[in-house]
Amino acid sequence: MSQSRYFFTSESVSEGHPDKVSDQISDAVLDEFLRQDPNSRVACETFVTTGQVIVGGEVTTKGIVDIQKIARRVVTEIGYTKGEYMFEANSCGVLSALHSQSPDINRGVDRKEEIADEFDRVGAGDQGMMFGYACTETPELMPAAIQFAQQLVKKLAEIRKEGKIMTYLRPDAKSQVTLEYIDDKVARVDAVVVSTQHDPEPAGMSEADFQAVIRKDIIENVVKVVIPAELLDENTKFHINPTGRFEIGGPHGDTGLTGRKIIVDTYGGAAPHGGGAFSGKDPSKVDRSAAYASRHVAKNIVAADLADKCTVQVSYAIGVARPVSIYIDTHGTAKHGLDDAEIQAKAEKIFDLRPAAIIRRFNLDRPHGWCYQDTAAYGHFGRDIFPWEKTDKVEELKKAFNLA
């Protein structure tokens, strides 16, 4: 029998990528509003470019937040602390253009005290559909390509901030991983792309020689540390700074905006995306909270060994608490003689997907042990610090199918 063979690619970007700088500022602003007032309604967008940060959006809150202070703190934490970067924490301009949220939206979302069930009192913040996904490719139950891509740029940032080796690194970086699959199983890594911003070449060293040093350092200290050795072979291709010199980067090299890295934030293209970005949005916005809940559903279904893959779609109408629809697809991998309809029926009873129930379950209005800024670089999923990654419904799912 012939084997099914194909290639699949995912990419990631570092915390210093301009779009991620914007995401982190937006989420840091959200964190502070929620810290002061857990009932805050926030939709915060950030624009970054050469020497400039603009923060805008809609807010309803009792809190008072120093936007300039937060933006400068985030930029400092990322590492833009030198004037030569043309975007520097202490000297960049910071403009706040936040204003009040529309009362028309408030009317549909805020609590309706006359309704008996408290979880029915809070409507969805908007219409739309959200997706969650899980699979058995990695211990985190995430697609392997995006996990490797995230870990590559995260490792680069760790090395840069430690400052012991590769001291030429600057904050902006991108990664991309191509996997070869045989019969739907990861067989090997076919290609790795890493582009990292760096200092000018040292005096007396040519560009070609400096790029050769960078290539060797990244392969040895980043790629081979992150990617399991058994997946690398003599045919794996390494594209390290493939265009050569990469000195100009960050917001000086490219303008950044909140919400432009939604595939990096999720599953690297291995699963559908409803189109709504996450960062800067409070948890009443189902673009964010329902995507987290959908991941929780999918991950628990896979962790319970009901299927090897699971996609969950949930949809909402603005102002309505209960989902308009829920859809579960195990891509033909359901086990124990189960079908998708059976799994969906049980899941709908076990997982409450009303926005207020989601917020309560994960304490999304009062994060503890994590913050929204943490989500804004290196992925919202596949990281155990986040409550929606818990496999706390496995036993209940198994019991529902008499598998416990």
Swiss-Prot record:
Q: Where in the cell is it found?
A: Cytoplasm
Region Disordered, annotated ranges:
1-20
InterPro entries with a match to the protein in the record:
ADOMET_SYNTHASE_CS, S-AdoMet_synt_C, S-AdoMet_synt_central, S-AdoMet_synt_N, S-AdoMet_synthetase, S-AdoMet_synthetase_sfam
Q: Which GO terms describe its biological process?
A: one-carbon metabolic process; S-adenosylmethionine biosynthetic process
Cofactor requirement:
Mg(2+); K(+)
Write out the GO MF terms.
Answer: ATP binding; magnesium ion binding; methionine adenosyltransferase activity
Protein EC: 2.5.1.6
Q: Where does K(+) bind?
A: 45
Q: GO terms for CC?
A: cytoplasm
Q: Which reaction(s) does its UniProt entry say it catalyses? A: L-methionine + ATP + H2O = S-adenosyl-L-methionine + phosphate + diphosphate
Note the Pfam families from the entry. S-AdoMet_synt_C, S-AdoMet_synt_M, S-AdoMet_synt_N
Family under the similarity heading: Belongs to the AdoMet synthase family.
Name of the protein in its database record: S-adenosylmethionine synthase
Organism expressing this protein natively: Chlorobium limicola (strain DSM 245 / NBRC 103803 / 6330)
Question: Gene encoding it?
Answer: metK
